[in-house]
Structures are given as C-alpha cells and as structure tokens.
C-alpha cells in the first residue's frame, strides 16, 4: 500500500497528496505549476534542495527559478560544471578555474600551455552548447569521505581533496556529468538542458562567463567595465599564490599545522602597507601642487570603511598632515523626511536620505576658511542636532569624509577633482572554496553585519538577513555604479577572515527558527562555514579591521 503525503506548495498556496518518495520534480508537475523560466531548485521546509530530492514526510515546498538569488546560484553552478566538462574534453591536459565575479559575470582562467585566443573561446562555447543540447543528467553520489578524497587525488584535483579531507565529515558527495567528475556544495539542476542562456567571451587574460539577468532572464546581464576592480582581485590572487593559500583547503591545512598566527601577521601587515601607500599618494599629490582637501571614502555595507578611515588618518598624520573625520551619517535628513522605497518603507540607502544642500553649504564654508558648527545625528530620536563642535580648517588639514555615497558626484558637484581623493573600500574575498567554487564577496560582508548587528545593535540574524536584500538593492543603485571612479581601491577582506568569523556567527545563525523564510539563508551560511577550520581571534591586533565587528578595537566608534 502506497503511503500518501500532504504537500503544501507556497507557489500557488495549495495542498495536495503525493506518494511517499516522490521527487520535487514529480511534485512540481503534479501541481501543474507554470513558471515562465522553469524551476531550478526548491525550498523544502525552508532548506534549498535539488529537484531530484525525494520527499518521505509531509513538507512545505516553494519552487525557485533564476529570478531568486538562490535559484541563480544553482544555475551558475550548473553552468560552470558544463564549462568544466567542455574544457576537459577540448584540453585533456588543461584546466579551468572560477576566480571571482566581475562585470556582471564570472571571471575564469583557462590553464593551458599557451596564450588563449578567440578561436579557443569559440571552441569552448560551441562545446558547451553541444553539452546543453545533449541534455546530460547531473548525477550525485554519496560515499565515505576517504573514498571521495582518493577519487579526487587520483584525478589530480588536490584542491577538492584537501578541502574534503579537512572537512571532518564521515560522508561526502560528488557529482558526475557523463565522465566528468566534480564537487559542488549545493544544488544543481537535473540536467544540462535546463541551461537556456549564457555566453562566454575573452576578457583580458581570461574568460568572462556571462549569465542571464535575474530581472529579465531572457536577456544576458550587460557587461560593465571594472578594470580597477579586476586589478585588485588579481593582485590579491597573486599574493595568495605566493603565500600558498589559494583555497579553503590550503587555509585549513595551514591552520592545522599551526601557521594561523603567521597568516594573521602577514595579512594584517599587507593591509597596513596598502593603507600607507594610499596615504603616501595623497601626500605626494599635495607636494605636486594638487591640493587634496577632501578624502572621500565609500563602500558597501560592512566593508570596514570606518576602521579604514581611522587607520588612513594615522598614516596621514605620520606624513605631517592633519586629517579630520566627518561622517555622512550626521547629515541625514530627519527620519520623517527620509524618502520611501517602492514598498513604502524608509529608504536609508538613498542618496536623498542625506541633506545634500546642508552638506554642501557646510563644506563650501569650511573650504573657504570659515568656521562651522558640525551636526550630529541622533539615531534614537531620528533627528539631526547641532553638536556644539566648531571646526575651521587650515592648510595642513584634510577632511576625511566617510559614507556610502562619498563617491557619488552629486555629493560634491562644485569641488574640483584635483581637490578630491576618492577611495573605494570593499571586502573582496579572493580565497576560493576550491578551483571551481568561488566565495561570494557579499557572504563575507553579510557575516560581518550579522555579528555586528547582534553584538552592538541588538538585532537577530533573522532581522539582518531579512533586511539584506534591500541593503543590496541600495548598493546596486547608489554605490556600485561609482566604484570605478575611485583613485584607489582597498580590499578589506583578510585571507583568514572567515575562519575567525566562524565561531562568532555560527551560534547567532543557529538561533534562526526553521519556520521563518530567513532560515534558508541561515542554513546555507552554516553549511558554508562548516568547510572552515576555526581560528581564534586572540592574535588579531586591536587595530584590525575585523575588530570593528568582533569587538576589542583600540579605536572609538
């Protein structure tokens, strides 16, 4: 006798019975759902699963397409596996690595014994199209971790072998696409035919894997030039290779062998060196007759802008300058005057949450050598107040203006460019899970923010995760379009960082109840953090950027 399950589908708000052991794809078809771009995965009791996942108990299910962030991650993983297979078939002695997101796509490196040409790109694209047309199934196999490690060692895939060997789990799984074996750490689509749209083009010394737009999946994302961002990523990838730490498996092995302190010291020293170089460049501009009066520091949420500005100020002081910090937060309009977003909620990420006329008035007065009384924003009352602090700048002073809109030309439209030095700060994660699995830079910042919000603002992880999509939307609209305007880019991510954040953020994430929608993201982050060996923060210096989020900083915030 077949046991029947009660399955609730969130997509159409209905419940139906299905036989025990039905796959998610069977359930999708049974509900007669029509998703214009097709399902690519599903949330089962708020946990993301592949469509071949079988159900043995009553469940709540929500099917996902590529208009969701989770669905797009599934699509990209599946697409990259196709690229891996294409390269394996075309270049048996070569390999491909997925380095990082850039220009609304993904930067990849083809490792062969010669410089790649346009004909190589065309061959790869054609082979990928053939693999998609063949509609080859992705198959998942679970086995003892020791056996999976040996499998990857035999194939020369030491990055995956090291990661799984240090993972600490009894069982691990791997995927196959025909004869091609690989490891991906979350859901894939059922078969290659699910991949409808992509492109691959030559991009500097590598390849750019282009993907559909989440807003309009019938079109590819437009390529956005990000030369400075690419340069920063590649510089740090070179540093990682010099240190011998390119993947999480490398990091885990180093930490297990007692080298965590060395990694902390070298990473912190590298950051301090970069900050000193930026301070020197500002000083040299002053000596060349280009009087820098403003240092504008921008970056997305939880990028470490505040600590960076304090450390830069110290370096400027060692060069004989007198920096004075000004936070754009103190120039917010009163909360009642804050613009509203499309959902009718206060849009604190909007440029117009800043009182632009008042800011420009005070800035002009200061630059004319006159005195102003600085404001202070009272976040409790939601009103701007005058602080009682008076400021007049002299020829040795530089204003350090920090805030998410600092690089927006509309903030300082009447200040000559030669009087401004612009810095973009972000946590650009350059370590990889393995050569085929990158770590999203947004994950790094989200983990920082969860810790900070819980520790200092009394927000739960559930609340921070719920707010994150609107924060990201604000970044896409107000911050990222201006990042290439920067005179300098500073990467605030530290090589060992995620291993240190792990012990702080895991207990907070575990408090998210599985009945709430945010559980899906909390569960994903917990699974991701499982791959890291923990590193204690006792060796972190008090001036570390991480101290802004963890506590124990010698700076006042």
Model regions and ranges:
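Conserved NTP phosphate-binding and transfer environment spanning the P-loop NTPase/kinase superfamily
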Residues: 286, 413-557
């Amino acid at each position: 006798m077949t046991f029947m399950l009660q399955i609730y589908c969130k997509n159409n708000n209905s419940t139906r019975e299905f036989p025990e052991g039905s796959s998610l794809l069977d359930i999708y078809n049974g509900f007669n759902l029509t998703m214009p771009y097709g399902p690519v995965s599903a949330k089962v009791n708020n946990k993301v699963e592949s469509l071949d996942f079988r159900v043995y108990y009553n469940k709540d299910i929500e099917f996902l397409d590529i208009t969701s962030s989770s669905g797009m991650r599934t699509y990209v993983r599946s697409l990259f596996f196709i690229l891996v297979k294409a390269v394996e078939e075309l270049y048996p002695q070569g390999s491909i690595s997925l380095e990082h997101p850039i220009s609304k796509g993904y930067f990849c490196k083809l490792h062969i014994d010669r410089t790649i040409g346009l004909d190589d790109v065309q061959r790869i694209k054609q082979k990928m199209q053939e693999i998609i047309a063949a509609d080859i199934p992705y198959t998942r196999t679970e086995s003892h971790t020791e056996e999976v490690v040996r499998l990857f060692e035999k194939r020369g895939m030491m990055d995956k072998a090291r990661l799984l060997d240090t993972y600490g789990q009894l069982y691990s799984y791997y995927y196959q696409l025909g004869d091609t074996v690989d490891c991906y750490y979350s859901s894939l689509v059922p078969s290659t035919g699910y991949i409808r749209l992509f492109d691959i083009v030559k991009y500097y010394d590598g390849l750019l894997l282009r993907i559909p737009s989440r807003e309009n999946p019938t079109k590819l994302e437009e390529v956005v030039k990000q030369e400075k961002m690419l340069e920063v990523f590649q510089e740090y990838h070179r540093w990682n290779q010099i240190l011998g730490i390119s993947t999480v498996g490398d990091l885990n092995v180093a930490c297990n062998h007692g080298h965590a302190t060395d990694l902390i010291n070298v990473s912190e020293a590298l950051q301090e060196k970069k900050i000193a170089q930026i301070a020197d460049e500002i000083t040299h501009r002053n000596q060349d007759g280009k009087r820098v009066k403003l240092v504008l520091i921008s970056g997305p949420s939880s990028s470490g802008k505040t600590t960076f500005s304090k450390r830069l100020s110290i370096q400027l002081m060692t060069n004989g300058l007198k920096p004075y910090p000004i936070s754009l937060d103190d120039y917010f309009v009163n909360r009642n005057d804050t613009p509203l977003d499309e959902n009718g909620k206060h849009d604190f990420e909007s440029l117009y949450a800043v009182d632009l006329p008042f800011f420009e008035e005070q800035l002009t007065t200061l630059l004319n050598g006159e005195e102003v009384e600085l404001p202070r924003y009272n976040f409790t009352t939601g009103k701007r107040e005058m602080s009682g602090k008076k400021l007049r700048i002299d020829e040795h002073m530089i204003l350090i203006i920090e805030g998410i809109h600092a690089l927006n030309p509309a903030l300082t439209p009447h200040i000559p460019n030669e009087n401004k030095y612009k810095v973009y700060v972000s946590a650009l994660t350059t370590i990889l899970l393995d050569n085929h699995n990158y770590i999203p830079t947004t994950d790094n910042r989200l983990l920082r923010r969860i810790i900070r919000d819980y520790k200092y603002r009394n927000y739960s992880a559930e609340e921070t995760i719920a707010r994150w999509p609107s924060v990201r939307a604000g970044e896409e609209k107000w911050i990222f379009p201006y990042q290439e305007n920067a005179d300098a880019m500073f990467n605030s991510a530290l090589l060992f960082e995620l291993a240190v954040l792990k012990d702080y953020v895991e207990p907070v994430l575990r408090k998210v109840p599985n009945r709430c929608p945010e559980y899906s993201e909390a569960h994903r982050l917990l699974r991701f953090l499982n791959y890291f060996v923990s590193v204690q923060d006792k060796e972190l210096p008090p001036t570390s950027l991480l101290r802004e989020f963890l506590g124990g900083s010698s700076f006042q915030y």
